[in-house]
Design a protein with these regions (language model features):
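N-terminal targeting sequences that direct proteins away from the cytosol to non-cytosolic compartments
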Residues: 1-167
Length: 167
């Protein structure tokens, strides 16, 4: 139940894309470099230690910027029930963590090309990724891209006159 929740598709996209990339390892194999990944979910099932599901998280356990979520339960049935009653809770949590991480990074390092052009032309301040170096700037329209062969990202900002609430 948890694996399928974490691998669920991002809603609203024209094609299916998973919300998160998941790597599953047995507890005995969770060593070395695996401990330094950004987001970790540790599931512990122990009927002698737990009577109900508990969820918590810690920051920076093995690496800076890391979030480790602990999901503890007495049995697999209680985890399935938790997944049903808290649908998308784990996905939403990890997505929010990643969004906050991206915001923090964009506050430190961003494209001055995008910032300067949008500020001067459209009076908009926008922190786009620093690798957005390609751009086209015309009256009321701005396009920028990282122009990458893989992982390409584009940004379009434009204005048009407001005429009524249906504009």
């Amino acid at each position: 139940a948890i694996k399928s929740e974490l691998a669920s598709s991002v809603p609203g996209l024209p094609q299916a894309e998973p919300s998160l990339k998941i790597t599953y390892v047995q507890p005995k194999d969770f060593t070395g470099l695996l401990r330094y990944v950004r987001n970790i979910l540790v599931v512990t099932i122990d009927p002698t230690a737990y009577t109900k599901v508990s969820v918590g998280y810690e920051n920076n356990v093995w690496a800076r910027g890391q979030v480790v979520v602990s999901l503890k339960a007495p049995n697999t049935e209680s985890i399935v029930e938790y997944s049903k009653t808290h649908e998308k809770a784990l996905v939403n949590f990890f997505v929010k963590v990643e969004m906050n991480r991206a915001i923090e990074q964009l506050q430190k390092e961003y494209s001055m090309v995008v910032m300067d052009n949008l500020k001067s032309d459209l009076n908009v301040m926008l922190n786009a990724p620093a690798n957005f170096t390609y751009y086209k700037d015309t009256t009321d329209f701005f396009w920028s891209s990282n122009n990458a062969n893989t992982g390409r990202m584009d940004l379009i900002v434009y204005t048009f006159p407001y005429t009524d609430p249906n504009t």
